[in-house]
Every structure is written in C-alpha cells, then in structure tokens.
C-alpha cells in the first residue's frame, strides 16, 4: 500500500467524478489506481451529490494521511438556440437561415437565439457554429435583433443546441447566477481549486477573485480563441490554466490546437504555475 501511495512523478492525474464513479468504493479505487486530483463537474449533479463526493474524498485523506486535491469546475454561461416546431430542421449547403430574438418556435427559415450579446458582437462574415461545430453558418447581414446567415457546413439542428461564436468577444459575464451559488457552496465545503469556464479576457477573472476571497486557487480554462490571443494577461490574473482542447478544436482548426497547447504550457511552466490539459 505504501508503494502505491508514494508518487514522485511530476505529471499528476485528474479524475472526473460522475454517475459511473460515484460510490465510496469507486473513488477509493481511482485514488489507489493513481488519481491525484478529483474534479467535481458542476454542470451535472445537485449539491447533495457534490457534498457526498467531497466527504468521501476527505475521508480518504484521513485514512491514508495524504492530501488529495479537489477541483470544482464551474459550468459557466451556455449559449443555445431555441426550440423548433418539429424538434429540429435539416440545413442544406448554401441555404439562408436567420437567428432572431422572437421566442416563437423555429422552422426551416429561422429560430430564436435568446442571447442579445451575440447580436451586439456579430459582424458580416463572422462564423456561427451549432452543435459543437457540426453545422456552420456565415453571417451575411445583421441588425440589432436579426442575424441573417448562409449555411457553409450543412447538418441537422435540433432544439437547444449549443452555439459558438469563434470570431466574437461577447459582452457576457463569466459567472451565471448558478455559478455564483455553486461557488459559495463548494467554497463552504472546502475545495482547493476553482476552474473558471468561458474565459475571454483577463477582466473575466477579476470578478471571481473578489467572490473567492482567497478561499481557493483559480484555474482559467482556455477554450476560446480570444483567450489564446490575450493569454499573458489571463495568466497574470490566474493561479493556473486548463487547456480545453476539445472546446478549442470546435472554434479553431483541429490541427492548430497541439502547437497552441504546447506554446501555452511552455509559457505557463516558465512561471511555475499549474497547468492541466483536458
């Protein structure tokens, strides 16, 4: 047992807990198999489930007299389209499609996009991505409440699919009301790190710093091209970074992600900050 727990490796293993790894036996087995950090994903599960997992981890700490790091990952803002009459539509290459603020059910010509911030920042020739990039549309015209597009990558779009805006910096608060409630809850429990989603610029981190009041370290998740562009400034405000390769690969060419990851990790290492890859 002592040999299993003597871990001198520099690279640590982060294990995300969820429904399939939820019991005391599961978490214990993951710890003994080499997990150094347990990630609590606050996008899923209620506070009672988070509290139970937290208690299991802290009991393991006492049992083995070894500190175990807990990382709480905030959900962050989620951008989604509205619902359709028939649950979704097939968008074909070259077709015209419109996003608006009208809450009526969508059809083959339009759908509600209930995020005014996107209408404020979108410009002609900007790209909008739907469903993790499976469908792409180019902005051809826009007003304060309508965005007209042309389909450049066809596919099926269904109710409440995620929307990405790789060309835009959105005037969007990084913390939702849910995030603020979750933040207070996990800080009262006692966690080591908070991962902040949807970081676009350094000022996004300043709000959470005030709310945290030094109760945990801040990991900034790099998942937007705009965050890559101002990485130095983000790093100045953070205690560490997480390179979210899957999210970056939605908004950037997939072949661009590995060299970006390598560069960001190198910059981070020079400052001796913690860095995670997901």
Question: Predicted segment positions?
Answer:
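Non-catalytic helical/linker scaffolds that mediate oligomerization, partner binding
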Residues: 1-278
């Amino acid at each position: 047992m002592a040999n299993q727990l003597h871990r001198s490796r520099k690279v640590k293993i982060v294990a995300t807990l969820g429904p399939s790894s939820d019991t005391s036996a599961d978490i214990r087995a993951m710890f003994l198999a080499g997990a150094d950090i347990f990630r609590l994903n606050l996008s899923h599960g209620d506070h009672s489930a988070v509290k139970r997992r937290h208690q299991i981890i802290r009991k393991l700490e006492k049992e083995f007299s070894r500190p175990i790091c807990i990382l709480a990952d905030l959900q962050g803002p989620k951008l989604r389209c509205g619902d359709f009459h028939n649950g979704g539509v097939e968008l074909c290459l070259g077709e015209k499609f419109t996003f608006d603020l009208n809450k009526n059910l969508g059809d083959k010509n339009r759908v509600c996009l209930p995020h005014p911030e996107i209408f404020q920042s979108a410009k002609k020739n900007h790209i909008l991505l739907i469903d993790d990039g499976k469908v792409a549309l180019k902005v051809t015209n826009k007003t304060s409440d309508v965005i007209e597009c042309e389909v450049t990558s066809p596919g099926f779009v269904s109710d409440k699919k995620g929307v990405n805006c790789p060309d835009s910096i959105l005037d969007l608060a990084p913390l939702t009301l849910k995030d603020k409630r979750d933040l207070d809850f996990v800080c009262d429990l006692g966690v080591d790190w908070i991962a902040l989603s949807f970081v676009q610029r350094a000022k996004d981190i300043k709000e959470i710093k005030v709310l945290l009041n030094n109760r945990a370290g801040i990991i900034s998740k790099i998942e937007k091209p705009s965050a890559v562009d101002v990485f130095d400034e983000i790093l100045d405000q953070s205690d560490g970074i997480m390179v979210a390769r899957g999210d970056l690969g939605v908004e950037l060419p997939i072949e661009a992600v590995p060299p970006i990851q390598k560069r960001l990790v190198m910059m981070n290492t020079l400052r001796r900050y913690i860095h995670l890859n997901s």
